[in-house]
């Protein structure tokens, strides 16, 4: 399946501007163009856009994303290095998830305190009426 940038944008949820930026940064390897020099997104290009979205959402720095792309361009002999980059990122994600879990619990406790206080205030106002 081959898609235009507009179709790729609709497929991935990325803006055409973001897709063009990714291409300028060299993050979409082997991107084809048609006879009019329009970008053509095949399944591999769409896969890269989806992966880049995932990596961005999970906080991988652009430099590390570029590293994965460059390693991929070098061929299968770099698969161990790509695994190492992704495992490092995954470990960072686990650390951040633990931090978020702790923060979430703290906020839940604070909300419970505020909601209890709010009920006490309502009860006090009702008693004064």
Predicted ranges, named:
Residues 10-13, 37:
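Conserved beta-strand-loop-alpha-helix junction that forms the acyl-donor binding cleft
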Residues 36-42:
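Minor-groove-contacting beta-hairpin "wing" of winged helix-turn-helix DNA-binding domains
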Residues 4-5, 10, 29-32, 43-129:
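Arg/Lys-rich, alpha-helical DNA-contact motif
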């Amino acid at each position: 399946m081959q898609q235009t940038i507009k179709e790729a944008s609709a497929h991935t949820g990325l803006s055409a501007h973001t897709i063009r930026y990714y291409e300028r940064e060299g993050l979409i390897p082997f991107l084809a163009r048609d006879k009019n020099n329009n970008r053509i997104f095949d399944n591999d290009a769409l896969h890269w856009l989806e992966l880049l979205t995932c990596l961005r959402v999970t906080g991988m720095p652009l430099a590390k994303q570029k590293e994965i792309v460059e390693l991929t361009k070098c061929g299968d002999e770099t698969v161990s290095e790509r695994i190492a980059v992704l495992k490092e990122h995954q470990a960072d994600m686990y650390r951040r998830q633990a931090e978020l879990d702790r923060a979430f619990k703290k906020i839940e406790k604070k909300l419970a305190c505020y909601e209890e206080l709010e009920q006490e205030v309502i009860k006090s106002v009702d008693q004064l009426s």
